[in-house]
């Protein structure tokens, strides 16, 4: 995993990824994720990295509070880590570069439309593929775009019981505004 990420890959860890107390560390991939859990073995470690960076690509279109579910307690950031969200000096979301690759740590991620969007953006960021965001994409996280390129069709789905407005981006990056009724599905030719 470390070699993959170091050479340009991405890794997303949720909760306690690769966690096993060994050689003074609990998170064995702490050099990729940039976080460690305080378990009484690293009390001598300086923990001064608490500044939040909520303007990050991963959080760009998620307003308000992020739901981490139960999340994890006692998580702190290593010095070169960028904390996206922390709560009472417990890291909830952080990012770190490792060699040519990137790692993302999320303390918990229960399913919701908003969290689905956050995970999607985390996948793009960790893969260094931010420029692919506006490809088969909806600006409203309650609305999804599904492309069936081989069949020459795509559909737009309103996942809610309420009308929604969005901007839909097609595979070529072109876009159009769309109003959808509750639970509506609209089909289009590519």
At which residue positions do the language-model features occur?
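A conserved amphipathic helix/loop scaffold
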Residues: 1-190
């Amino acid at each position: 995993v470390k070699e993959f990420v170091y050479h340009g890959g991405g890794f997303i860890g949720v909760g306690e990824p690769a966690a096993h107390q060994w050689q003074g560390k609990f998170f064995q991939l702490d050099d990729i994720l940039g976080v460690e859990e305080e378990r009484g073995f690293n009390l001598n470690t300086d923990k001064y990295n608490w500044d939040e960076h909520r303007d990050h690509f991963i959080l760009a279109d998620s307003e308000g509070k992020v739901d981490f579910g139960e999340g994890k307690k006692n998580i702190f950031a290593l010095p070169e880590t960028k904390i996206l969200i922390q709560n009472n000096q417990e890291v909830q979301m952080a990012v770190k570069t490792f060699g040519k690759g990137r790692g993302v740590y999320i303390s918990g991620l229960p399913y919701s439309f908003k969290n689905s969007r956050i995970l999607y953006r985390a996948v793009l960021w960790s893969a260094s593929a931010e420029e692919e965001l506006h490809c088969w994409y909806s600006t409203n996280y309650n609305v999804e775009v599904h492309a069936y390129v081989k069949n020459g069709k795509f559909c737009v789905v309103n996942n809610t019981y309420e009308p929604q407005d969005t901007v839909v981006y097609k595979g070529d990056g072109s876009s159009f505004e769309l109003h959808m009724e509750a639970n509506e599905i609209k089909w289009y030719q590519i």
